[in-house]
Protein backbone atom coordinates (compact mmCIF):
# COMPACT_ATOMS: atom_id res chain seq x y z
CA UNK A 1 0.00 0.00 0.00
CA UNK A 2 1.38 3.32 -1.04
CA UNK A 3 1.37 5.92 1.75
CA UNK A 4 -0.51 9.11 0.99
CA UNK A 5 1.56 12.09 0.00
CA UNK A 6 2.01 14.72 2.65
CA UNK A 7 -0.09 17.83 2.06
CA UNK A 8 1.72 20.46 0.06
CA UNK A 9 2.01 23.86 1.76
CA UNK A 10 -0.21 26.45 0.16
CA UNK A 11 1.74 29.12 -1.65
CA UNK A 12 0.86 32.61 -0.44
CA UNK A 13 0.63 35.34 -3.10
CA UNK A 14 3.47 37.86 -2.84
CA UNK A 15 2.56 40.93 -0.83
CA UNK A 16 1.77 44.03 -2.90
CA UNK A 17 4.65 46.47 -3.20
CA UNK A 18 4.67 49.13 -0.55
CA UNK A 19 3.64 52.57 -1.75
CA UNK A 20 6.53 55.00 -2.15
CA UNK A 21 7.27 56.70 1.07
CA UNK A 22 7.41 60.45 0.55
CA UNK A 23 7.86 61.27 4.20
CA UNK A 24 11.39 62.23 5.12
CA UNK A 25 12.32 61.11 8.60
CA UNK A 26 15.05 62.91 10.44
CA UNK A 27 16.76 61.31 13.42
CA UNK A 28 18.70 63.55 15.72
CA UNK A 29 21.21 62.34 18.24
CA UNK A 30 20.23 63.47 21.67
CA UNK A 31 23.02 64.69 23.93
CA UNK A 32 24.09 62.44 26.74
CA UNK A 33 22.48 63.08 30.08
CA UNK A 34 24.41 65.56 32.13
CA UNK A 35 26.15 67.24 29.18
CA UNK A 36 23.07 68.55 27.37
CA UNK A 37 23.17 72.03 28.87
CA UNK A 38 26.81 72.57 27.98
CA UNK A 39 26.32 71.24 24.43
CA UNK A 40 23.25 73.34 23.77
CA UNK A 41 24.85 76.52 25.11
CA UNK A 42 28.02 75.97 23.06
CA UNK A 43 25.92 75.24 19.98
CA UNK A 44 23.79 78.35 20.49
CA UNK A 45 26.89 80.50 20.95
CA UNK A 46 28.41 79.10 17.76
CA UNK A 47 25.15 79.68 15.91
CA UNK A 48 24.98 83.26 17.16
CA UNK A 49 28.57 83.91 16.07
CA UNK A 50 27.78 82.52 12.62
CA UNK A 51 24.73 84.77 12.30
CA UNK A 52 26.68 87.86 13.36
CA UNK A 53 29.49 86.94 10.96
CA UNK A 54 26.94 86.46 8.18
CA UNK A 55 25.37 89.87 8.80
CA UNK A 56 28.61 91.79 9.39
CA UNK A 57 30.30 90.50 6.27
CA UNK A 58 33.01 92.31 4.37
CA UNK A 59 30.73 93.58 1.59
CA UNK A 60 28.23 95.09 4.01
CA UNK A 61 30.92 96.81 6.09
CA UNK A 62 32.51 98.26 2.93
CA UNK A 63 29.10 99.61 1.85
CA UNK A 64 28.51 101.33 5.19
CA UNK A 65 32.06 102.75 5.14
CA UNK A 66 31.61 104.13 1.61
CA UNK A 67 28.40 105.83 2.69
CA UNK A 68 30.24 107.46 5.59
CA UNK A 69 32.88 108.81 3.18
CA UNK A 70 30.05 110.58 1.34
CA UNK A 71 28.74 111.84 4.67
CA UNK A 72 32.16 113.31 5.53
CA UNK A 73 32.24 115.10 2.17
CA UNK A 74 28.81 116.60 2.91
CA UNK A 75 30.19 117.66 6.30
CA UNK A 76 33.04 119.49 4.53
CA UNK A 77 30.54 121.21 2.23
CA UNK A 78 28.51 122.36 5.22
CA UNK A 79 31.50 123.65 7.19
CA UNK A 80 32.94 125.69 4.31
CA UNK A 81 29.49 127.11 3.52
CA UNK A 82 29.01 128.08 7.17
CA UNK A 83 32.36 129.91 7.29
CA UNK A 84 31.58 131.73 4.03
CA UNK A 85 28.09 132.80 5.11
CA UNK A 86 28.67 133.68 8.79
CA UNK A 87 32.29 134.81 9.02
CA UNK A 88 32.72 136.46 5.61
CA UNK A 89 29.07 137.26 4.72
CA UNK A 90 29.40 135.53 1.34
CA UNK A 91 25.89 134.16 0.66
CA UNK A 92 26.48 132.75 -2.81
CA UNK A 93 24.87 129.28 -3.08
CA UNK A 94 24.35 129.53 -6.86
CA UNK A 95 27.95 130.60 -7.47
CA UNK A 96 29.19 127.70 -5.34
CA UNK A 97 27.09 125.26 -7.39
CA UNK A 98 28.35 126.92 -10.57
CA UNK A 99 31.96 126.21 -9.57
CA UNK A 100 31.14 122.54 -9.05
CA UNK A 101 29.36 122.20 -12.39
CA UNK A 102 32.29 123.88 -14.16
CA UNK A 103 34.66 121.29 -12.65
CA UNK A 104 32.36 118.46 -13.77
CA UNK A 105 32.24 120.01 -17.24
CA UNK A 106 36.04 120.30 -17.49
CA UNK A 107 36.65 116.70 -16.37
CA UNK A 108 33.72 114.60 -17.57
CA UNK A 109 32.09 116.55 -20.41
CA UNK A 110 35.44 116.93 -22.17
CA UNK A 111 35.98 113.18 -21.69
CA UNK A 112 32.72 112.54 -23.55
CA UNK A 113 33.72 115.05 -26.24
CA UNK A 114 36.90 113.14 -27.16
CA UNK A 115 35.23 109.72 -27.25
CA UNK A 116 34.39 108.01 -30.51
CA UNK A 117 31.24 106.26 -31.66
CA UNK A 118 27.92 106.05 -29.82
CA UNK A 119 29.44 107.24 -26.52
CA UNK A 120 30.51 110.57 -28.01
CA UNK A 121 29.03 113.77 -26.57
CA UNK A 122 27.20 114.72 -29.78
CA UNK A 123 25.72 111.23 -30.17
CA UNK A 124 24.42 111.34 -26.59
CA UNK A 125 22.95 114.80 -27.09
CA UNK A 126 21.13 113.69 -30.24
CA UNK A 127 19.44 110.82 -28.39
CA UNK A 128 18.85 112.07 -24.83
CA UNK A 129 19.51 115.81 -24.62
CA UNK A 130 16.07 116.75 -23.23
CA UNK A 131 16.27 114.18 -20.41
CA UNK A 132 19.62 115.50 -19.20
CA UNK A 133 18.40 119.08 -19.53
CA UNK A 134 15.52 118.34 -17.13
CA UNK A 135 17.82 116.41 -14.78
CA UNK A 136 20.38 119.23 -14.69
CA UNK A 137 17.68 121.76 -13.81
CA UNK A 138 16.27 119.48 -11.07
CA UNK A 139 19.71 118.93 -9.55
CA UNK A 140 20.52 122.65 -9.50
CA UNK A 141 17.21 123.72 -7.94
CA UNK A 142 17.35 120.96 -5.30
CA UNK A 143 20.63 122.40 -3.99
CA UNK A 144 19.34 125.97 -4.19
CA UNK A 145 16.01 125.38 -2.39
CA UNK A 146 17.52 123.65 0.64
CA UNK A 147 20.27 126.28 1.08
CA UNK A 148 17.72 129.08 0.64
CA UNK A 149 15.46 127.55 3.31
CA UNK A 150 17.99 128.37 6.06
CA UNK A 151 17.11 132.07 5.61
CA UNK A 152 13.45 131.47 6.51
CA UNK A 153 13.14 128.54 8.91
CA UNK A 154 15.05 126.97 11.80
CA UNK A 155 17.86 124.44 11.73
CA UNK A 156 15.60 121.86 13.42
CA UNK A 157 12.95 122.19 10.71
CA UNK A 158 15.53 121.80 7.96
CA UNK A 159 17.02 118.69 9.58
CA UNK A 160 13.65 117.02 10.14
CA UNK A 161 12.02 117.91 6.83
CA UNK A 162 15.15 117.01 4.86
CA UNK A 163 14.43 113.39 5.87
CA UNK A 164 11.46 113.61 3.48
CA UNK A 165 13.90 112.63 0.73
CA UNK A 166 13.92 109.03 2.09
CA UNK A 167 10.22 108.18 1.46
CA UNK A 168 10.47 109.98 -1.91
CA UNK A 169 13.40 107.76 -2.95
CA UNK A 170 11.66 104.61 -1.68
CA UNK A 171 8.44 105.32 -3.60
CA UNK A 172 10.22 106.29 -6.82
CA UNK A 173 12.52 103.24 -6.58
CA UNK A 174 9.48 100.99 -6.05
CA UNK A 175 7.49 102.28 -9.03
CA UNK A 176 10.20 103.20 -11.54
CA UNK A 177 13.18 100.96 -10.69
CA UNK A 178 10.90 98.09 -9.53
CA UNK A 179 12.95 97.61 -6.37
CA UNK A 180 11.24 95.49 -3.71
CA UNK A 181 12.04 95.81 -0.02
CA UNK A 182 11.78 93.39 2.89
CA UNK A 183 10.57 94.04 6.42
CA UNK A 184 14.15 94.39 7.69
CA UNK A 185 14.75 97.27 5.26
CA UNK A 186 11.80 99.22 6.64
CA UNK A 187 12.92 98.49 10.20
CA UNK A 188 16.38 99.84 9.37
CA UNK A 189 14.88 102.98 7.80
CA UNK A 190 12.72 103.63 10.88
CA UNK A 191 15.74 103.17 13.19
CA UNK A 192 17.76 105.67 11.12
CA UNK A 193 14.98 108.26 11.29
CA UNK A 194 14.66 107.70 15.05
CA UNK A 195 18.39 108.43 15.33
CA UNK A 196 17.88 111.64 13.38
CA UNK A 197 15.04 112.62 15.71
CA UNK A 198 17.31 111.99 18.68
CA UNK A 199 19.87 114.41 17.21
CA UNK A 200 17.24 117.10 16.70
CA UNK A 201 16.07 116.63 20.29
CA UNK A 202 19.65 117.06 21.49
CA UNK A 203 19.93 120.30 19.50
CA UNK A 204 16.85 121.66 21.25
CA UNK A 205 18.01 120.58 24.72
CA UNK A 206 21.47 122.14 24.46
CA UNK A 207 20.08 125.31 22.87
CA UNK A 208 22.03 125.04 19.64
CA UNK A 209 21.62 128.06 17.37
CA UNK A 210 18.41 127.56 15.40
CA UNK A 211 18.51 130.49 13.00
CA UNK A 212 16.11 133.35 12.53
CA UNK A 213 13.02 131.45 11.42
CA UNK A 214 11.35 134.64 10.15
CA UNK A 215 8.86 132.85 7.86
CA UNK A 216 8.76 129.20 8.84
CA UNK A 217 6.03 128.18 6.40
CA UNK A 218 8.01 129.43 3.40
CA UNK A 219 11.20 127.81 4.72
CA UNK A 220 9.49 124.49 5.40
CA UNK A 221 7.97 124.43 1.92
CA UNK A 222 11.40 125.16 0.42
CA UNK A 223 12.91 122.22 2.33
CA UNK A 224 10.13 119.85 1.23
CA UNK A 225 10.52 121.01 -2.37
CA UNK A 226 14.29 120.57 -2.25
CA UNK A 227 14.00 117.11 -0.65
CA UNK A 228 11.53 116.02 -3.34
CA UNK A 229 13.85 117.22 -6.11
CA UNK A 230 16.80 115.49 -4.41
CA UNK A 231 14.84 112.23 -4.38
CA UNK A 232 13.96 112.52 -8.08
CA UNK A 233 17.58 113.34 -8.94
CA UNK A 234 19.00 110.42 -6.92
CA UNK A 235 16.65 107.81 -8.37
CA UNK A 236 17.22 109.12 -11.91
CA UNK A 237 20.96 108.98 -11.26
CA UNK A 238 20.71 105.35 -10.12
CA UNK A 239 18.80 104.43 -13.27
CA UNK A 240 21.40 106.10 -15.53
CA UNK A 241 24.50 104.62 -13.91
CA UNK A 242 23.01 101.10 -13.95
CA UNK A 243 21.88 101.21 -17.58
CA UNK A 244 24.38 103.64 -19.14
CA UNK A 245 27.55 104.92 -17.45
CA UNK A 246 28.83 107.08 -14.63
CA UNK A 247 30.92 109.26 -16.97
CA UNK A 248 27.91 109.99 -19.18
CA UNK A 249 25.81 111.02 -16.17
CA UNK A 250 28.47 113.33 -14.72
CA UNK A 251 29.40 114.78 -18.10
CA UNK A 252 25.83 115.70 -18.96
CA UNK A 253 25.13 117.03 -15.46
CA UNK A 254 28.24 119.20 -15.79
CA UNK A 255 27.11 120.51 -19.17
CA UNK A 256 23.52 121.43 -18.33
CA UNK A 257 24.22 122.27 -14.68
CA UNK A 258 26.86 124.82 -15.69
CA UNK A 259 24.50 126.27 -18.31
CA UNK A 260 21.51 126.74 -15.98
CA UNK A 261 23.52 127.81 -12.93
CA UNK A 262 25.34 130.40 -15.06
CA UNK A 263 21.99 131.88 -16.14
CA UNK A 264 20.64 131.83 -12.58
CA UNK A 265 23.86 133.40 -11.27
CA UNK A 266 23.65 136.25 -13.77
CA UNK A 267 20.00 136.95 -12.93
CA UNK A 268 19.77 136.41 -9.16
CA UNK A 269 23.20 136.52 -7.55
CA UNK A 270 25.52 138.83 -9.46
CA UNK A 271 25.07 141.64 -6.92
CA UNK A 272 25.88 139.34 -3.97
CA UNK A 273 28.99 138.16 -5.78
CA UNK A 274 30.22 141.73 -6.20
CA UNK A 275 29.88 142.32 -2.44
CA UNK A 276 32.20 139.45 -1.49
CA UNK A 277 35.38 140.82 0.21
CA UNK A 278 37.84 138.72 -1.75
CA UNK A 279 41.06 137.62 -0.03
CA UNK A 280 43.11 134.44 0.25
CA UNK A 281 40.94 133.02 3.07
CA UNK A 282 37.73 133.34 1.09
CA UNK A 283 39.46 131.92 -1.97
CA UNK A 284 40.66 128.95 0.08
CA UNK A 285 37.15 128.32 1.40
CA UNK A 286 35.73 128.36 -2.12
CA UNK A 287 38.43 125.91 -3.20
CA UNK A 288 37.65 123.64 -0.24
CA UNK A 289 33.93 123.77 -0.96
CA UNK A 290 34.45 123.00 -4.66
CA UNK A 291 36.79 120.09 -3.87
CA UNK A 292 34.29 118.51 -1.45
CA UNK A 293 31.38 119.06 -3.84
CA UNK A 294 33.29 117.66 -6.82
CA UNK A 295 34.36 114.65 -4.74
CA UNK A 296 30.75 114.06 -3.64
CA UNK A 297 29.40 114.18 -7.20
CA UNK A 298 32.20 111.99 -8.55
CA UNK A 299 32.06 109.37 -5.79
CA UNK A 300 28.30 109.16 -5.21
CA UNK A 301 27.56 107.22 -8.46
CA UNK A 302 30.13 104.60 -7.39
CA UNK A 303 28.41 104.11 -4.03
CA UNK A 304 24.90 104.16 -5.53
CA UNK A 305 25.88 101.48 -8.04
CA UNK A 306 27.29 99.30 -5.25
CA UNK A 307 24.34 99.87 -2.90
CA UNK A 308 21.29 101.97 -3.86
CA UNK A 309 19.96 105.52 -3.73
CA UNK A 310 18.01 104.68 -0.57
CA UNK A 311 21.10 103.37 1.22
CA UNK A 312 23.09 106.48 0.24
CA UNK A 313 20.44 108.84 1.61
CA UNK A 314 20.32 106.90 4.88
CA UNK A 315 24.11 107.17 5.13
CA UNK A 316 23.98 110.93 4.63
CA UNK A 317 21.92 111.31 7.82
CA UNK A 318 25.18 111.20 9.79
CA UNK A 319 26.57 114.26 7.97
CA UNK A 320 24.95 116.66 10.45
CA UNK A 321 26.52 114.73 13.31
CA UNK A 322 29.99 114.95 11.77
CA UNK A 323 29.45 118.69 11.35
CA UNK A 324 28.38 118.92 14.97
CA UNK A 325 31.43 117.00 16.23
CA UNK A 326 33.65 119.38 14.25
CA UNK A 327 31.66 122.30 15.63
CA UNK A 328 32.53 121.25 19.19
CA UNK A 329 36.10 122.39 18.45
CA UNK A 330 35.57 125.03 15.75
CA UNK A 331 32.42 126.80 16.94
CA UNK A 332 32.36 125.73 20.63
CA UNK A 333 29.05 123.90 20.45
CA UNK A 334 27.72 122.33 23.63
CA UNK A 335 28.04 118.55 23.83
CA UNK A 336 25.26 116.14 24.74
CA UNK A 337 25.38 112.37 25.14
CA UNK A 338 22.31 112.21 22.92
CA UNK A 339 24.53 113.07 19.96
CA UNK A 340 26.52 109.85 20.44
CA UNK A 341 23.28 107.91 20.95
CA UNK A 342 21.95 109.41 17.71
CA UNK A 343 25.12 108.53 15.80
CA UNK A 344 25.14 104.88 16.87
CA UNK A 345 21.37 104.56 16.34
CA UNK A 346 21.76 105.69 12.73
CA UNK A 347 24.67 103.28 12.23
CA UNK A 348 22.58 100.41 13.65
CA UNK A 349 19.79 101.32 11.23
CA UNK A 350 22.30 101.30 8.35
CA UNK A 351 23.57 97.86 9.36
CA UNK A 352 20.00 96.54 9.55
CA UNK A 353 19.16 97.97 6.14
CA UNK A 354 22.36 96.61 4.59
CA UNK A 355 22.09 93.17 6.21
CA UNK A 356 19.95 91.72 3.42
CA UNK A 357 19.41 92.28 -0.28
CA UNK A 358 16.62 94.08 -2.05
CA UNK A 359 15.10 92.67 -5.22
CA UNK A 360 14.15 93.92 -8.65
CA UNK A 361 10.76 92.59 -9.76
CA UNK A 362 10.93 91.59 -13.42
CA UNK A 363 7.98 89.20 -13.41
CA UNK A 364 5.26 88.51 -10.81
CA UNK A 365 6.85 85.09 -10.14
CA UNK A 366 10.51 85.70 -10.91
CA UNK A 367 12.78 88.02 -8.93
CA UNK A 368 16.29 88.96 -9.85
CA UNK A 369 18.62 89.73 -6.98
CA UNK A 370 19.73 93.34 -6.74
CA UNK A 371 23.38 94.10 -6.08
CA UNK A 372 23.20 95.29 -2.50
CA UNK A 373 25.81 95.19 0.25
CA UNK A 374 24.92 91.82 1.79
CA UNK A 375 27.19 89.90 -0.55
CA UNK A 376 28.17 89.10 -4.13
CA UNK A 377 25.48 88.02 -6.57
CA UNK A 378 25.98 84.65 -8.25
CA UNK A 379 24.14 84.24 -11.53
CA UNK A 380 22.57 80.81 -11.82
CA UNK A 381 21.75 79.17 -15.16
CA UNK A 382 18.17 79.77 -16.22
CA UNK A 383 17.50 76.05 -16.85
CA UNK A 384 18.51 74.87 -13.39
CA UNK A 385 15.81 74.50 -10.74
CA UNK A 386 16.71 76.39 -7.59
CA UNK A 387 15.61 74.79 -4.34
CA UNK A 388 14.94 77.15 -1.46
CA UNK A 389 17.20 76.68 1.52
CA UNK A 390 14.44 75.39 3.84
CA UNK A 391 13.58 71.95 5.23
CA UNK A 392 10.21 70.65 4.11
CA UNK A 393 8.25 67.37 4.09
CA UNK A 394 6.58 66.19 0.89
CA UNK A 395 3.39 64.13 1.41
CA UNK A 396 2.67 63.32 -2.21
CA UNK A 397 4.05 63.24 -5.72
CA UNK A 398 4.55 66.66 -7.23
CA UNK A 399 2.58 66.94 -10.45
CA UNK A 400 3.46 70.46 -11.45
CA UNK A 401 6.82 72.08 -11.82
CA UNK A 402 7.28 75.01 -9.50
CA UNK A 403 8.41 78.37 -10.90
CA UNK A 404 12.08 79.21 -10.60
CA UNK A 405 12.67 81.47 -7.61
CA UNK A 406 15.77 83.22 -6.30
CA UNK A 407 15.78 82.91 -2.53
CA UNK A 408 17.92 85.30 -0.53
From Swiss-Prot:
One of its GO terms (molecular function) is transmembrane transporter activity. The keyword Kinase does not apply. InterPro entries: SLC35_F1/F2/F6, SLC35F_Transporter. Keywords: Cytoplasmic vesicle, Membrane, Synapse, Transmembrane, Transmembrane helix, Transport. Pfam families: SLC35F. One of its GO terms (cellular component) is synaptic vesicle membrane. Residues 1-20 are annotated as: Disordered. The chain crosses the membrane at residues 60-80, 94-114, 129-147, 159-179, 186-206, 221-241, 247-267, 284-304, 311-331, 335-355. It comes from the Eukaryota. It is a multi-pass membrane protein. The keyword Membrane applies. Its main location: membrane. It is found in: Cytoplasmic vesicle, Secretory vesicle, Synaptic vesicle membrane. Belongs to the SLC35F solute transporter family. Putative solute transporter. This is Solute carrier family 35 member F1. The gene is Slc35f1.
Amino acid sequence: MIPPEPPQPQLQPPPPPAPPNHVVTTIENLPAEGSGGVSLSASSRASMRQRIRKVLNREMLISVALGQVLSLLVCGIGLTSKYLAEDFHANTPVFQSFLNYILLFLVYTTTLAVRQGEENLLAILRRRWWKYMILGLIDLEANYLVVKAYQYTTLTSVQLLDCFVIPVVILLSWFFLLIRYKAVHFIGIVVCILGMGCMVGADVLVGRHQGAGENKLVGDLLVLGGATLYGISNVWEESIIRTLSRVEFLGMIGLFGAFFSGIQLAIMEHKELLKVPWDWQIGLLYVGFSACMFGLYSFMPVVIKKTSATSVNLSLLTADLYSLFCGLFLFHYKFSGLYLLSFFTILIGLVLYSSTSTYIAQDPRVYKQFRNPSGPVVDLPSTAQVEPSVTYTSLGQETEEEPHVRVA
